[in-house]
Amino acid sequence: MTFSIENNKQVVLGEELGKLSDNERLKTQSNFLRGTIEQDLQDRITGGFTADNFQLIRFHGMYQQDDRDIRNERAKQKLEPLHNVMLRARMPGGIITPKQWLAIDKFATEHSLYGSIRLTTRQTFQFHGVLKPNIKLMHQTLNSIGIDSIATAGDVNRNVLCTTNPVESELHQEAYEWAKKISEHLLPKTKAYAEIWLDGEKVETTEDDEPILGKTYLPRKFKTTVVIPPQNDVDVHANDLNFVAIAEKGKLIGFNVLVGGGLAMTHGDTSTYPRRADDFGYIPLEKTLDVAAAVVTTQRDWGNRSNRKNAKTKYTLDRVGTDVFKAEVEKRAGIKFEVSRPYEFTERGDRIGWVEGIDGKHHLTLFIENGRLLDYPGKPLKTGVAEIAKIHKGDFRMTANQNLIVAGVSKSNKAKIEKLAREHGLMDEGVSEQRKNAMACVAFPTCPLAMAEAERFLPQFVTDVEGILDKHGLDKEDNIILRVTGCPNGCGRAMLAEIGLVGKAPGRYNLHLGGNRGGTRVPKMYKENITDKQILEEIDQLVGRWANERLPNECFGDFTVRVGIIEEVIISKRDFYA
């Protein structure tokens, strides 16, 4: 036995990791994720959930939040915070039909505090500001259109991402089908979701079984992608498990498997760090689900259940050794990884505007700044997408860059859809390449973990950066992958950007430099805890040097490493804080 839990302590490969964290107690006592959520739903005295259920609802795809803009004012009035939930839907590969879209649009308008639909870096949508009396209605509305939110949060395999490649339609369809299969294979098997939210028939707990995830589920969240090179729109190095599509003559034949990526860290704790995924090798298609389960169960058994800050797969690999972890996966899956097939990641951005697929269908990628679909003055974006949904015969594809593709448009419908998009501000040639390559997480006012602004901060910040690029005579193609995340948990994927800002306190950020265009290098901290004004001053100086000293076609991140402005991070555990 390579692992054991005795006397509330965890031992892995002979090493005692310590006393189990309280989250392990919570999961053990939850009766396969049921807890006392149903009782909490009946309690109308508070808008929130009790301590254990506050954590357990995450496994059902929700986070308890409140409006931090009004928290202090409510406290003065002797009121509890305005508790509500954010829901993240499970949409493997980000594909949603027009009928489904119209239903989620209606729910967001009628039953959420903010009336918005938020496209996220997890290639799905979120509802924000849903009050307790509307939570069950939300789940039942989604269920009626074939959507759920099972395992989009919590210590489970989360929404499976897939490259949105509308041009190579057949290859994308194959990759998407695998994303769906992986999602279903790794999904929790408990009936708790149906019982609580869909008024499903109660079953005896002895019928529950979790053959892959186990009774206490995973040590920490787990993220999986299917990616089609050379596009790295899903950011493989932000994820625990990645299947890199290998094709011959446009047909999918197998995957290279990358394991152990992840971006979250904790300020001031050098045992935490962002990390690139390791390439385990190539597998044929028929071994995909076996390998997925083997990686997940190895992490289930070997991951740190004592210290949640060191519980993710990336730390397990660094603790036990990549070769040891890989050998265990091979043993459990009954395979030997072959040598990786050649591939390269060159870009991550979405191709905004129209493209024609090899199947003759047209696809329109709409740039949605920060993924927030709402009706703004003069730009009724949310209404615009709903109007398109009313006439669109194909599907919509949410991207991991928080944009939206109107996919599978016939030639006869193309002009009508473009007209609607332009009328509602969804197509705008005035949007710069720099803005298209910038991204932020939600942060304030709804995220309880945010230390600084991100989504509300980014638009003006990008305008300021655009001014700096213009000042130094750079062309519109000379843009920088720029990302802002409101806290070190990394939802905005700033730790794979050429310029990454990580929130430290209100109005203050850590400035990281040195990522690259393809998302294959972790940036390093350049300045700590500085204001946005100071950040812009630093960027001004750095961009000035880049404009004058760069090599032909040298991107900003590569330049900062080459000239020694920042040291390259090769092995994160060794280099990130060095």
Swiss-Prot record:
Cofactor(s) needed by this chain: siroheme; [4Fe-4S] cluster
Record keywords, A-Z: 4Fe-4S, Amino-acid biosynthesis, Cysteine biosynthesis, Heme, Iron, Iron-sulfur, Metal-binding, NADP, Oxidoreductase
SUPFAM superfamilies: Nitrite and sulphite reductase 4Fe-4S domain-like (SSF56014), Nitrite/Sulfite reductase N-terminal domain-like (SSF55124)
GO biological process: one example: cysteine biosynthetic process
Quaternary structure (record): Alpha(8)-beta(8). The alpha component is a flavoprotein, the beta component is a hemoprotein.
General function of this protein: Component of the sulfite reductase complex that catalyzes the 6-electron reduction of sulfite to sulfide. This is one of several activities required for the biosynthesis of L-cysteine from sulfate.
The name this protein goes by in its record: Sulfite reductase [NADPH] hemoprotein beta-component
Organism: Vibrio vulnificus (strain CMCP6)
The organism's taxonomic lineage, starting at the top: Bacteria, Pseudomonadati, Pseudomonadota, Gammaproteobacteria, Vibrionales
Designated gene of the protein: cysI
